[in-house]
Design a protein with these regions (language model features):
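Amphipathic alpha-helical assembly/interaction segments
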Residues: 1-119
Length: 119
């Protein structure tokens, strides 16, 4: 059984974990046509993976499984961050500071939950 405080943190992470899907999907529309099906597709898959892995981990029976899925979600978040940086360096898009801050905030939230599950 998970403590209520941890469930609250997870609910918040799930809510914020889907923050960027609409924003990233919108950014991908500005990619050159040939990149929409390469880098753009990779962006979309990574973005969908974040809340999906949070939800799947929440449904697991053990703390270690739960932490593993949250770790996968955090890895996908870093993947999105890296891909957005690349798209920005290639001048495909301009990534807002708000989006960058949201990624950092969610990463910290996930790290905190993972740490609590593992201790």
């Amino acid at each position: 059984m998970r403590p209520a405080a941890l469930n609250t943190e997870v609910s918040e992470a799930r809510r914020h974990g889907g923050f960027e899907d609409e924003q990233v999907y919108g950014l991908v529309r500005h990619f050159p046509t040939d990149e929409r099906y390469a880098l753009g597709d990779q962006h979309r898959r990574a973005v969908v993976s974040i809340p999906s892995n949070i939800a799947e981990g929440n449904g697991r029976d053990s703390k270690s499984d739960y932490a593993r899925f949250l770790s996968i979600a955090r890895g996908s978040l870093f993947e999105v961050q890296t891909q957005l940086g690349l798209a920005e360096r290639l001048n495909y898009v301009t990534v807002s500071e708000g989006l960058k801050e949201s990624i950092t905030r969610i990463s910290k939230m996930l790290y905190s939950i993972i740490h609590k599950l593992r201790t």
